Amino acid sequence: QNEQVFEKAVKMINGFKEYFISHNEVVYDNPSPGNKQGGITTLEDKSCGCVQKGGSAPIMDVIDYGEPVTTKGLNMLYGPGNDLVSATALTAAGAHMVLFSTGRGTPFGAPAPTLKIATNSQLAGKKKTWIDFNAGVVADGERTLDEAGADLYRLVLDVASGKQTCAEKKGFR
């Protein structure tokens, strides 16, 4: 967006590095065992995935953990790469719903309704009571990307209108 937003992003990244170093942690050991098993071997690989999920919109602001979003558009949120902590941070920032993609199936419910989206049909089949949407149907050739996208969009609207997610049905929120 502008130089100020760029500087906030740089400060956020360097702040994480400084935090890891100050606690004698190796910065580049960040990808979890699950990430590594899925093919993500470096912090750079993991970061590229985050950037891709953001799309091509310009970053409008960088906000601290627990700080609400005040700027329209794409915002970067300061927080660790931990599923539970990240979903809580999103909710604290003002998210009314969390769309959580997973290739391994983290079983949790966040403070806001959390749609868990399986990236593969094997996971969706194994964890039917955890997974709300199977995006693996695209890779399987059962649905086109546009068809699956339309299905997910309808599900998001349904949940926004009161339909419970799998976690909510089990009382986790």
Positions of predicted regions on the chain:
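Anaerobic metallocofactor- and corrinoid-dependent redox/one-carbon enzyme cores
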Residues: 1-173
